[in-house]
C-alpha cells in the first residue's frame, strides 16, 4: 500500500511539474536580427536576417515618451525583458502599450510598438537590423 501511495504521489508531482505556463494575455512570434550595407542604392539595403538570440525589452511607451534627457539604459533595466533563443518569442504581458527593442540596436517606430489587450495573445513577428556601413 505504501509503495502504491508513493508511486501515485510521484506521478502527481511529475504531472504538476510538466504543466506549461499557459497565459491568456501576451504575445507569441518570431524575432529576427539582421545587418546590411546601408550605402545608398536604388534597391535599398539588402538585409540578411537570422533568428535572434539575446534580450528583448518591452519598455512602457508612456515612460519612454517622458524620458526626456533621462537614461535609456536605466529604463531598459526596469522594463519587462525576456531571453530569446532561436528567435522564439512567447511571453505573458500586462495590458499596456510597449516599445519593443533588443540590446544591440534601438528603433522607435510603429513597427516595434505593441498594444497588449486583455485576454488577447497577439501573434507578431519582429525584424531588427543595423547598418554595417553608410
Where do the protein language model's features map onto the residues?
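Structured interaction patches on ligand/partner-binding surfaces of diverse proteins
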Residues: 104-134
Amino acid at each position: 500500500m505504501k509503495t502504491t501511495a508513493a508511486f501515485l504521489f510521484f506521478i502527481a508531482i511529475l504531472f504538476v511539474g510538466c504543466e506549461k505556463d499557459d497565459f491568456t494575455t501576451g504575445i507569441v512570434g518570431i524575432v529576427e536580427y539582421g545587418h546590411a550595407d546601408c550605402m545608398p542604392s536604388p534597391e535599398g539595403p539588402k538585409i540578411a536576417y537570422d533568428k535572434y538570440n539575446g534580450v528583448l525589452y518591452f519598455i512602457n511607451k508612456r515612460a519612454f515618451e517622458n524620458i526626456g534627457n533621462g537614461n535609456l539604459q536605466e529604463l531598459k533595466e526596469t522594463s519587462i525583458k525576456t531571453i530569446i533563443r532561436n528567435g522564439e518569442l512567447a511571453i505573458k504581458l500586462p495590458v499596456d502599450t510597449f516599445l519593443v527593442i533588443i540590446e544591440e540596436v534601438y528603433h522607435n517606430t510603429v513597427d516595434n510598438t505593441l498594444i497588449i489587450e486583455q485576454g488577447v495573445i497577439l501573434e507578431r513577428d519582429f525584424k531588427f537590423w543595423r547598418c554595417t556601413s553608410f
